[in-house]
Amino acid sequence: LLPAANTVIFFFSHQVPDIASVFFGQQVTTSQVIDLARDLLAEGITHARDALDWPDIKDTLERAAKDFRIACGPDNGRWSTQQLPTDAPLWAALDTLQETLGEVSRTIEPATVRAETLAQVAERLHGLMESFEQWRNHSIMSQGEMICWVEALTYSVRLNATPLSVAEGFTRQRESDHMRTWIFASAT
């Protein structure tokens, strides 16, 4: 939670369930893909300009992320995966985004030996691939432990996996902190 803190204070303890569900949940966004694409372009041009067509790689990643947002429809909104039909356009767009991440990963792999920072961006890419895959697996196999939902924002999409109960994770966190004091306060 906070590795160096001796005391954990919750001033609005009546909000602990809401906050904990976000804390113990998982999320991945298309904004992360776009940020990664821009970082990949900067590092690629700086350290391996002659290796690949970095602007094209950036554009490919950005296009896949933006197409995923477009597939969610023109309006902002939130939908649980249970509300979405299996043939909803966003599923195909998510598949395309995941395939694009995989293709880019394979394409840039030989160039990552040129600079540590380029290798670090490649590691972020692998982390994003894992996050999208984990969310997809949760959305298929959560069996009542988590609710997976899609949040379409103006320019991005956020995929969330939120536990239905935070009791176990919260208790585990609290019990692992033998040397900390926990204080809960609420005005309500």
Show the residue positions of the predicted features:
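ASCE RecA-like P-loop NTPase motor cores
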Residues: L1-T188
